[in-house]
């Protein structure tokens, strides 16, 4: 949105219409993009506009959603200007016309030179002397590929390091994960790679996968028909908004009872129940309680005690006999061992978690006590960052899934043990070359590596122990900058030698591939401009594995390219360098990147997985990805197809609604494997901070801000709301600190310090806080510890610190609301 407007131009009937999946959260709401000449607009009569709606009279409620933020004016490379409108699709089964505060701003985030996206990277940029200068792709690749080659030729590929996206949505997609992955793993063959939100190359669901159950195993429709929905370490209203509003709440308020009767004839059904596991009373809990307070249970556990909670519940339901005995006997292994290891009485469970025994019993009865005629309840367990980033990710998932398997709450409609997700998904890559989980941040901190590429991510804001990472990266980067600044008149080849020599003295050459010059630009020497959906064709899948094609409808700014084509440029430059030297083995390694479009990359990766003659490919589409084509995906529109694809019938892809309905699991023996998960308390580094500091520093997202605020930092709507990352405090704690709403406070511990804006909230427990995660101004990751579990997954949620008042900024107090965010505002 280039400027504020109080009217919205309607698209004419001949406007171009394309499909778009929301760029942001994992729900992947369906939208339509309308594009037409700037100096034209449609009429108010239904036959005069592309929406087919009659604006000559008052429209019925929710007939459509139109706001100025859903419109923009874009300019093509030939100078032609067009209006665009991006609005939610009522026919999409995901959102049914609902928009979120994130997706509803997509049009404004499309590039316009006079809009909020004016700071987009348009050309490769090279740090020369003391300033950033635009350069050509040829020059940028001569430096980037030249340094890569020099390091490879010296024989230590581990010195070439990456931090990269592994997901779908605006910052990823099947085309781009394949392009980047093929470059890193097949061509360069470096093992020193980390993923965007964790400091190694790993899964966030190792335990569940080892137990035979993938983390996205049901459909959003299952939430409509569940007897009980568990929300564990998850705030779905703010982080999966329209999944919560369009699928969860209708169950809670009884709107889906007729559907349950149709699906489960002869089985007792009724309005749904919800159980939230979260130390904090979130907006999701407030909304659910406003909807049906007597059908909502909040288990406000002590921080980090999830394992104890699930072990206590497992022990109790086994004692009561509320388990699927036949299923356990026929389709699982390891039950007795898990029950023995996880043994915990309700009394001990209550003591550790802080949840009363009565609440624990009620949760167990709601969720696992057989219904009339012995029918097992259909209970869906949804989890996210409270587990993913919790106290020993591996152990928590094991304990939760032990409970789920014992009660057969997977593979039946209305069940599922699923992560709610952050980004959309879109993974297809060659296997990691060694399978190692290298703690890349620590490699950098310890002075290892020569070349670091941050690709579609910003770990300066989002990593654990982020302050230490930034400090060392900046110091090592400066060694290279100092050497480069003295290299006046150097050719690209000479500059590569100078950079390499500087890395031999402790320096680190940094490249950032992104939409914007993020905080990483402070350390970078080279920035490469990427494109996002709309400027390219991109496929992703959402949290129910629903794959869609977001169609290109505009030019990317300047010379920006899709990530897959950036990867191809790097590979082809290296190939040419090795051809010139007559090294056929290296030429072969860097071959296979002859892509002209992102569709070429899609065909080379996603559609080749599991096909005869193809190299090994890890793909979320599996071996039937070959059935997906851009043509079929365009025809499938915003509803797409749920992966894996079973077959194509009459030009339509037939997908998979739910996994494990045949009781065949993803293990060698096809059975679900219980996994012992003892309660071990808090990790030592976390316990040490807890002993020294008063406040638990919980953290997470807010509805209005997407991830690292890479777009939002340029949006006045968001910036004025949150000029600084906020920290919610108990009012009594705030008073004892002499802190008023809107004050600036320092948050600190042994790992770092950061600033935040005080936000007293009556729902916050004493000594608990909640800080906005990953924000551009006030970085919560500065105070997380460097502790990781056996799979190098950090405990982002587990840190303690102190808080002190810094002062007051009067402008904040005049313009920033600190009204309680809960929807039951009293």
Swiss-Prot record:
Keywords: 3Fe-4S, Iron, Iron-sulfur, Metal-binding, Molybdenum, Oxidoreductase. It is an enzyme of class 1 (oxidoreductase). The keyword Ubl conjugation does not apply. Substrate binds at residues 196, 204, 419, 423. The keyword Oxidoreductase applies. It holds the Pfam family Rieske_3. It comes from the Bacteria. One of its GO terms (molecular function) is metal ion binding. The record marks 100 as: Involved in charge transfer. Its cofactor is [3Fe-4S] cluster; Mo-bis(molybdopterin guanine dinucleotide). One of its GO terms (biological process) is respiratory electron transport chain. Heterodimer consisting of a large and a small subunit. Belongs to the prokaryotic molybdopterin-containing oxidoreductase family. Involved in the detoxification of arsenic. Oxidizes As(III)O3(3-) (arsenite) to the somewhat less toxic As(V)O4(3-) (arsenate). This is Arsenite oxidase subunit AioA.
């Amino acid at each position: 949105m280039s400027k504020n407007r109080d009217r919205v131009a309607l698209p004419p009937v001949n406007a171009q219409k394309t499909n778009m999946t929301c760029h942001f959260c994992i729900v992947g709401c369906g939208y339509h993009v309308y594009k037409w000449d700037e100096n034209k607009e449609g009429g108010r009569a239904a036959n005069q506009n592309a929406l087919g709606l009659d604006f000559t009279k008052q429209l019925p409620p929710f007939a459509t959603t139109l706001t100025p933020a859903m419109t923009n004016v874009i300019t093509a490379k030939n100078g032609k200007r067009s209006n665009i409108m991006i609005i939610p699709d009522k026919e999409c089964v995901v959102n049914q016309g609902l928009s979120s505060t994130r997706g509803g701003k997509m049009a404004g985030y499309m590039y316009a030179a006079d809009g909020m996206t004016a700071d987009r990277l348009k050309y490769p940029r090279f740090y020369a002397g003391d300033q950033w200068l635009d350069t050509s792709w040829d020059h940028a690749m001569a430096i980037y590929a030249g340094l890569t080659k020099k390091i490879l030729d010296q024989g230590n590929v581990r010195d070439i390091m990456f931090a990269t996206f592994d997901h779908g949505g605006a910052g990823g997609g099947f085309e781009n994960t394949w392009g980047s992955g093929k470059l890193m793993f097949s061509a360069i063959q470096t093992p020193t790679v980390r993923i965007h939100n964790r400091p190694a190359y790993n899964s966030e669901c190792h335990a569940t996968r080892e137990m035979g159950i993938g983390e996205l195993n049901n459909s959003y429709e299952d939430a409509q028909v569940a007897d009980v929905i568990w929300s564990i370490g998850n705030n779905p209203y703010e982080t999966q908004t329209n999944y919560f509003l369009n699928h969860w709440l209708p169950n809670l308020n009884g709107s889906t009872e007729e559907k349950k009767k149709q699906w489960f004839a002869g089985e007792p059904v009724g309005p749904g129940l919800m159980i939230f596991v979260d130390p904090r009373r979130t907006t999701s809990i407030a909304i659910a309680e406003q909807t049906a307070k007597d059908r909502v249970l909040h288990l406000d556990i002590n921080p980090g005690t999830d394992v104890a909670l699930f072990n206590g519940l497992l022990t109790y339901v086994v004692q009561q006999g509320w388990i699927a005995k036949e299923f356990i006997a026929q389709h699982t292994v390891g039950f007795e061992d898990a029950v023995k290891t996880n043994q915990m009485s309700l009394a001990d469970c209550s003591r550790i978690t802080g949840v009363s025994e009565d609440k624990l019993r009620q949760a167990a009865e709601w969720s696992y006590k057989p219904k009339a005629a012995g029918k097992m309840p259909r209970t869906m367990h949804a989890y996210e960052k409270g587990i993913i980033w919790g106290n020993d990710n591996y152990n928590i998932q094991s304990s939760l899934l032990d409970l789920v398997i014992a009660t057969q709450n997977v593979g039946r409609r209305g069940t599922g043990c699923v992560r709610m997700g952050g980004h959309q998904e879109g993974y297809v890559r060659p296997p990691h070359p060694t399978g190692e989980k290298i703690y890349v941040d620590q490699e950098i901190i310890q002075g290892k590596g020569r070349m670091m590429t941050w690709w579609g991510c910003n770990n300066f804001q989002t990593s654990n122990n982020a302050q230490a990472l930034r400090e060392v990266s900046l110091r090592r980067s400066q060694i290279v900058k100092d050497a480069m600044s003295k290299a006046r008149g150097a050719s690209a080849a000479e500059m590569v030698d100078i950079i390499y020599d500087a890395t031999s003295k402790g320096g680190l050459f940094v490249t950032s591939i992104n939409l914007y010059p993020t905080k990483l630009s402070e350390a970078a020497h080279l920035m490469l401009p990427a494109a996002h959906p709309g400027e390219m064709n991109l496929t992703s899948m959402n949290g129910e594995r629903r794959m869609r094609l977001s169609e290109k409808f505009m030019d990317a700014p300047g010379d920006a390219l899709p990530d897959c084509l950036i990867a191809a440029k790097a590979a082809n430059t290296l190939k040419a360098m090795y051809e010139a030297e007559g090294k056929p083995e290296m030429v072969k390694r860097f071959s296979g990147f002859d892509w002209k479009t992102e569709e070429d990359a899609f065909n080379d990766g996603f559609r080749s997985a599991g096909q005869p003659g193809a190299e090994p490919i890890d793909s979320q589409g599996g071996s039937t990805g070959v059935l997906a084509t851009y043509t079929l995906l365009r025809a499938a529109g915003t509803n797409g197809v749920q992966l894996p694809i079973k077959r194509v019938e009459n030009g339509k892809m037939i997908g998979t609604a739910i996994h494990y309905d045949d009781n065949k699991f993803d293990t060698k023996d096809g059975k679900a494997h219980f996994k012992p998960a003892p309660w071990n308390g808090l990790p030592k580094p976390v316990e040490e901070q807890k002993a020294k500091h008063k406040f638990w520093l919980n953290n997470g997202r807010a509805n209005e801000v997407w991830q690292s605020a890479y777009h939002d930092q340029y949006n006045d709507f968001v910036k004025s709301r949150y000029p600084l990352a906020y920290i919610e405090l108990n009012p009594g704690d705030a008073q004892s600190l002499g802190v008023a709403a809107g004050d600036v406070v320092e948050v600190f511990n042994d790992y770092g310090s950061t600033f935040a804006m005080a936000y007293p909230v009556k729902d916050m427990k004493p000594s608990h806080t909640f800080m906005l995660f990953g924000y551009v101004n006030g970085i919560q990751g500065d105070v997380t510890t460097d502790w990781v579990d056996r799979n190098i997954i950090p405990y982002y949620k587990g840190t303690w610190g102190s808080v002190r008042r810094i002062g007051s900024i009067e402008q904040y107090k005049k313009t920033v609301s600190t009204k309680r965010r809960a929807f039951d505002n009293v």
